[in-house]
Amino acid sequence: MYAIIKHSGKQYKVSVGDELKLDHFEAESKASIEVSEVLAINDKELKVGAPFVAGAKVVLEVINHGKDKKVVIYKKRRRKDSKLKRGFRRQFTRVVVKDIKA
């Protein structure tokens, strides 16, 4: 059994027990989150929503929050003695799929 969910503008294919790294959102650790934006669900037969499957929910549990590795952005303009170096660390929320309700 799997489901395709939409969270913060991105789509994820999930099954029970899967661990996901989603974009950061405000929630406490060990909190349960219900996602009702289920695009498709496969439980013996495939149900595709228009745009969402009616009555379907996916229950997620927040494990922790964190930051990815730093991405360094470096720009250099040749012969101009001009350069720019910046770093960026994306924040994420790690969740585990507890239940899929059809």
From Swiss-Prot:
This protein binds to 23S rRNA in the presence of protein L20. Keywords: Ribonucleoprotein, Ribosomal protein, RNA-binding, rRNA-binding. This is Large ribosomal subunit protein bL21. One of its GO terms (molecular function) is rRNA binding. PANTHER family: 50S RIBOSOMAL PROTEIN L21, LARGE RIBOSOMAL SUBUNIT PROTEIN BL21M. GO terms for biological process: translation. Part of the 50S ribosomal subunit. Contacts protein L20. Pfam families: Ribosomal_L21p (PF00829). Belongs to the bacterial ribosomal protein bL21 family. InterPro entries: bL21-like, bL21-like_sf, Ribosomal_bL21, Ribosomal_bL21_CS. HAMAP family: Ribosomal_bL21. GO terms for cellular component: cytoplasm; ribonucleoprotein complex; ribosome. The keyword Iron does not apply. It comes from the Bacteria.
